[in-house]
Amino acid sequence: MTSSTESKHSNDESTDLEKQDAEESHGLPEERKQDIAAQLSSSDVQDPNLVDWDGPDDPANPMNWPKSKRLGHVVMASLTTLFANITSTAFAPAASSLEAEFGITSSITAALTVSIYLLGFAFGPLVIAPLSEHFGRLPVYRVCTVITVAFLIGCAQAKNLGMFLVFRLITGIAGSGPGTIGGGTIADVMAPENRGKAMGAFAMGPLMGPVLGPLMSGFIAQYLDWRWVFRVLCIATGVMTIVLYFVMTETYGPVLLKRKAARLRKETGNPDLHTKLEASGVSPLASLWMALQRPTKMLIFSPITLLLSLYCAFVFGLLILLFTTFSAVYRQQYGFNVSMGGLSYLGLGFGLAIGLVLFGMLSDKVAKKDSARSSEWKPEARLLLMVWFAPVIPGGFFWYGWTAYYKVHWILPMMGTSLIGMGALMVMMPIQVYLVDAFGPRVAASALAANTLLRSLAGCFLPLAGPSLYEALGLGWGNTLLGFIAIGFTCLPILFYRFGGKLRLRFPVTF
């Protein structure tokens, strides 16, 4: 009963897609046809029971959906990721009122109330990404957003510190879902040469979310209390969850093909019909176990994944360190109150916004131009922007540290953090797009999960060192130390730009 209903729905949907696509474009661009053809098996006449896409123009393939539908999924993936990342730091301006209510005196414990969310961001992807590659993207989006809403309510109603920390950790685990599989969703619906702008929109979540959070919650914390921060987040995330349920559909190709094979087996009565994945002879349980291991294995056996994820983690950890110390720095150095403290994030936010615009304008153009010299698409071309902008980060730290130390007008430290924000985006975004392009839709979510694991661990634990670092070395030398470490990382994009192709061949992801 269910299968026949699904069959009828699928046939109707395919007919609609064919009509819309024909009206929209009268044929696919040749570049997209070539990319889709790469997903198809070579006409395997030796296996007439193999179920695959019906050629490169198959309207059921998410790559061939109408542009509006594909962009709709990019927007939803980006917005759900943005909301999850707003939640990561929105609580920061209100942390002092929670500390007073629960009698927190340790600076490390105080920082943990904000950063423990990112501990959930670290470990959630290790399970969430493999589940999306086994069961599909859509169930993961739905389950994660519902759990997030439920535990945001828990945070708002917490009666003691232990309860709050547990609820916030679980919120972080569930909140990591959209960011973990969003890159996979984009890989499902966008051709490699057109992913730059889509990934730029997606980057608003991990990079702009932590900036927008304190800006939005600063006045709530000033005039209400910390519990209302979580209530507002719960309402906003709940609305987004309802929209997601009505707008998003499944995009993961292997899952769609498995459904197609099941439908055809029922319609034709041929039990031998199968997909390439089903033909591998691997049981569903074994396939799930392999998928669960994949992110960890990529960190161990792929130097590309490990080293670039370490760089991304360091940069992200620096951003969260700044987020958790801005309020104290601007209060002590410039006398900002709680509501004004949210304004201290503007410089970093402005820099991230500038970086986002630059990345959207330049990424695809630079990558296509660089690849054209070798007459083939080269994922390493994505790293060229990173080579150019990586030195901006240490420069920003030197500027911010010493202007804040000498209490120069508050606009100047913000200008320094603008440089940090722009440089951070132009480092982190090329890494994420490169991982998607280098490993392809099949394991893109696992590659990003491995990246998210290290990034979130750094985001959780590096900020804990911030107060002690500034207390021991001061704002000037403390930020100078961070800048010098950042200089050491600038050689990585150059090395991977030149030798990344050879490393991909030397260490292929076959697991």
UniProtKB/Swiss-Prot annotation:
InterPro entries referenced in this protein's UniProt entry, alphabetically: MFS, MFS_dom, MFS_trans_sf
Q: Which UniProt keywords apply?
A: Glycoprotein, Membrane, Transmembrane, Transmembrane helix, Transport
Q: Which domain of life is it from?
A: Eukaryota
Q: What cystine linkages occur within this chain?
A: none
Job description of the protein: MFS-type transporper; part of the gene cluster that mediates the biosynthesis of macrophasetins, 3-decalinoyltetramic acids (DTAs) which feature a tetramate (pyrrolidine-2,4-dione) unit connected to a decalin fragment and that have potent bioactivities. Efflux pump that might be required for efficient secretion of macrophasetins.
From the Swiss-Prot or TrEMBL record, give the protein name.
MFS-type transporper mpsC
Q: Name one Pfam family in it.
A: MFS_1
Annotated Gene Ontology cellular components are:
membrane
Transmembrane annotation, as ranges: 74-94, 108-128, 147-167, 169-189, 201-221, 228-248, 303-323, 342-362, 383-403, 411-431, 443-465, 476-496
Chain residue ranges for the region called Disordered? 1-65
**Which residues are glycosylated according to the annotation?**
N337
Stretches with biased composition (Basic and acidic residues): 1-35
Give the family, as the similarity comment puts it: Belongs to the major facilitator superfamily.
